[in-house]
Swiss-Prot record:
Gene giving rise to this polypeptide: chlL
GO annotation (BP), single: photosynthesis, dark reaction
Name of this chain's protein: Light-independent protochlorophyllide reductase iron-sulfur ATP-binding protein
Summary of subunit composition and partner proteins: Homodimer. Protochlorophyllide reductase is composed of three subunits; ChlL, ChlN and ChlB.
Family, per entry: Belongs to the NifH/BchL/ChlL family.
Alphabetized UniProt keyword annotations: 4Fe-4S, ATP-binding, Chlorophyll biosynthesis, Iron, Iron-sulfur, Magnesium, Metal-binding, Nucleotide-binding, Oxidoreductase, Photosynthesis
GO MF, one example: ATP binding
Keyword Cell division applies: no
């Protein structure tokens, strides 16, 4: 049975880089994986393929929306590690709806019987405040994964996405698998948030420059690690996420905080940060 994942997070947080590396990690675990980019920039799969692949919406327009004239090889491109890649594309700037494009993408892939061929399908989705259109992949997902960092804005976006998961979970068995902290040197604010809005934290990746560089190079960390074994430990973070997802976790239907409540919680943490114990304080406690 196919497992479907939807990856969300604040714009610029590193969703696509994270998604590509998770897709490769899943492939390394022997799964046949399809990654679907849901962003008008159509750059979700760039680090898997090394170039901007044509979008489904462009292909449909070229064929005058005659689905019967489209073959799998017209829209599905092979990426690193054997991961298959699709870019939904999007409507012209300032016009149309991204949700419609996602719907057309799913419709075409079903026409091609593509969904039945994969162990895991991963949607990499644009947007940090999830409108009805870009929440569409949640209609098909078993699990949502939220990429964040240790900052106010990213966690505020995560809370909004959690609200969308709760809403979509009313109509089908969608669960939030958990948060993924990306390129952050601390996790204290993440822990503060999940103590108030309970949800798993799948992994927190440290502030590793190679993660950012991989995006510019158009390569996953796994591909970069082939020439630099020092990066193997970075790949282990993504393999750990893949293992947790493949274990079919129970997940949660989150109960998000209200905007005012969250603003108060996180801003108070900035204004009144906890006092870190010094080494001398810890020694004093040990002597008591």
């Amino acid at each position: 049975m196919t497992m479907t994942l939807a990856v969300y997070g604040k714009g610029g947080i590193g969703k696509s880089t994270t998604s590509c590396n998770i897709s490769v990690a899943l492939a390394k675990r022997g799964k046949k994986v399809l990654q679907i980019g849901c962003d008008p920039k159509h750059d979700s799969t760039f680090t898997l393929t090394g170039f901007l692949i044509p979008t489904i919406i462009d292909t449909l327009q070229e064929k005058d929306f005659h689905y019967e004239d489209i073959w799998p090889e017209d829209v599905i491109y092979k990426g690193y590690g054997g991961v298959d890649c699709v870019e939904a594309g999007g409507p012209p700037a300032g016009a149309g709806c991204g949700g419609y494009v996602v719907g057309e993408t799913v419709k075409l892939l079903k026409e091609l019987n593509a969904f039945d061929e994969y162990d895991v399908i991963l949607f990499d989705v644009l947007g940090d405040v999830v409108c009805g259109g870009f929440a569409a992949p949640l209609n098909y997902a078993d699990y949502c994964l939220i990429v964040t960092d240790n900052g106010f804005d990213a966690l505020f976006a995560a809370n909004r996405i959690a609200a969308s998961v709760r809403e979509k979970a009313r109509t089908h068995p969608l669960r939030l698998a958990g948060l993924i902290g990306n390129r952050t040197s601390k996790r204290d604010l993440i822990e503060k948030y999940v103590s108030h809005v309970p949800m798993p934290v799948l992994e927190v990746l440290p502030l590793i420059e190679d993660i950012r560089v991989s995006r510019v190079k158009g390569k996953t960390l796994f591909e970069m690690a082939e020439g630099d074994s020092m990066l193997d430990y970075v790949c282990d973070f993504y393999l750990n996420i893949a293992d947790q997802v493949l274990a079919a976790p129970e997940g949660v239907v989150p109960s998000e905080a209200s905007d005012r409540e969250l603003f108060s919680l996180l801003s108070d943490y900035y204004l009144n940060p906890p006092v870190e114990k010094t080494q001398e304080d810890e020694l004093d406690l040990m002597m008591v």
